[in-house]
Amino acid sequence: MKLIQNIDVYAPQHLGKKDVLIINDKIVKIKDAGSISADGFLSETERINGEGLLLTPGFIDSHVHVLGGGGEGGFANRTPEATMEGLTKFGVTTVVGCLGTDGIGRDICALVAKTKGLNEQGMSAYCYTGSYQIPVRTLTDSIVKDIMMIQEIIGTGEIAISDHRSSQPTFEEFARVIADTRIGGVLSGKAGIVNVHLGDSPRCLDLIERVVDETEIPATQILPTHINRNEMLFGKSIEYALKGGAVDFTGNEDIDYWETICDEVRVCNGIKRMLDAGVNPDRITISSDGQGSLPMYSSDGKFLGMGVGQSSCLLKEVKECVFKTEIPLEIAISTITSNPADILCLKEKGKVEEGYDADLCILDQELQLVEVIAKGNTVYKK
């Protein structure tokens, strides 16, 4: 049992000073500061003084290569697996794992096993079936069955389009993957969403827009990611988001380099531009591409080198939104809490609310992490 007292709550909406009572893995009571007395609780109840601190939902990183990524420059360039400690120390209490370019050296069986392991270790973890490639490599004999029968699988991804590393799928092939994923979600009560990797081809979101325009499949079944890869793609993504589509920014710890070399759009600037254009803030998310390779290629497609994505970028991007572009904290923090929870149908996640999972971050006034709570247990303390 934990009692957090007199803390300024962003749920993500600003609630002001509150007392928050946690029993086991749930938030059971939220009252005005001073309303929940410590008297009468068990002596072992942990009391946390929240004076001068902020409380937010635990962060949701919706795109992490938990098995590691890379390999695009050869076997020596494979990146390491994610660890629970490596995620929670950056405030991530919920992770969604995926495969990328390599769907052979890493497979869905191993991804599901890794996801189960992270859950058993004390955080919340989900995953996608598939990888860049179409036809999709699944654990069972179909996308629908994977989503229906494997608890951890919530959709398909990351399917690559507009990229030289994709399978160059036809419109019909791409639409069928999204249709099957939707049916799997409908039958299982899950999101049934397709996480779509966008490359730097001028075709941008063409295939996605055709699915939305030419079929009965709603835009809510698709989450395009890496939308800030370059200015051209970002401009198209604003247009897509204005039509109601959800969009996912990829955070970056080395944005000063990528902004110059690759025309990448800085997350805080991109979100500000979207908000100014009238995009619904609820349709915007940020993910890290954690443990994924960040390959660099020459103009003729030659591999030049590789970096590794880090979940640390989530809070860094939120800070830049708040302190550089003056986006309200409740909007900035929703991109890594309530928005991904709603878009991915992660029940009882993403909010500081009675009955929700006790996944929480305590921060100071400079938005530095002080403590992280996952499933009611402290998993990081400064």
Model-derived regions, located:
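C-terminal cap of metal-dependent C-N hydrolases
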Residues: I7-V9, I27, V352-K382
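Active-site core of metal-dependent hydrolases
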Residues: D180-P295, F303-L304
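His/Asp/Glu-enriched, well-ordered alpha-helical/loop segment
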Residues: D276-Y356, L360-L363
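Active-site gating loops and adjacent loop-to-helix segments of metal-dependent hydrolytic enzymes
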Residues: G74-N77, E81-G97, D146-S167, V177-D180, ...
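Divalent metal-dependent hydrolysis catalytic cores, especially in the metallo-beta-lactamase
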Residues: A82-P135, I150-H164, R182, V186-S201, ...
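Divalent metal-coordination and catalytic microenvironments
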Residues: I7, V20, D25, G52, ...
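Metal-associated gating/positioning segment near the N- to mid-region
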Residues: L42-T45, G50-A113
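Histidine-rich, glycine-flanked metal-binding segment
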Residues: M1, V9-T56
